Amino acid sequence: MTRTPTTRMGLLEVRGRADVASKGARLLRAKREVLAGELWKLTREVLAGRARLDEVLRGAVKALGLARALEGEEALASVALTAAREVPLQVSVRRVWGVPTPSVAAPALIRAADERGSSPTSWGLAGTEAARRHEEALEVLLRIASRELHLARLGEEIQATSRRINALEQLVLPALTAESGRIEAALEERDREDVVRLKRFRARRPRREASARRP
């Protein structure tokens, strides 16, 4: 830290900087509390989403196994090729206390039987159910992915905010307090020296006046 001049203006400057640092730490703590609340809420959503994804995937795998047994591997592979498609994703960024957090959005992924690139009659009931369950699993997966991206970003920002709070409270504020104390002690010592000099001056003044009155 740059050494501040040992003056009353310097003391006011250091105290002002300490006040700003203290207010900054309080604001950062408030920010961290908001982010922590958002993190806790999002964590519960992600855990619930993962449980839902596990449930949906188990159903999808079971439905696919049944479709393979009833309709055959080749028939399923043929209709699956015609059902292939690209899924357009929209990635946007929103801010929570100034923290940019990504969000992923996709259109509805579960399609009707006649929207999978071939005649509905090409699909057996088991194959149709397997396709629907896998499309549902993809929808759930994308929702979780968006929330997990948000969760990771919030965690990073909370850590960064904690580091800034620690720097202010453990480094900046103690240094400013020490500097303020140094200047204040120096000014008090200077004031005491001025008082002593003034007393000496006043003590010598009568003697000088008496000497001046002598013939």
Swiss-Prot record:
Residue ranges of coiled coil: none
Function: Produces ATP from ADP in the presence of a proton gradient across the membrane.
Protein name: V-type ATP synthase subunit D
Gene3D superfamilies (alphabetical): 1.10.287.3240
Gene Ontology molecular function: ATP binding; proton-transporting ATP synthase activity, rotational mechanism; proton-transporting ATPase activity, rotational mechanism
Superkingdom of origin: Bacteria
Species this protein is from: Anaeromyxobacter sp. (strain Fw109-5)
InterPro entries linked: V_ATPase_D
Keyword terms, alphabetized: ATP synthesis, Hydrogen ion transport, Ion transport, Transport
Keyword Transcription regulation: no
PANTHER family, per database record: V-TYPE ATP SYNTHASE SUBUNIT D
GO annotation (BP), single: proton motive force-driven plasma membrane ATP synthesis
Protein family per UniProt: Belongs to the V-ATPase D subunit family.
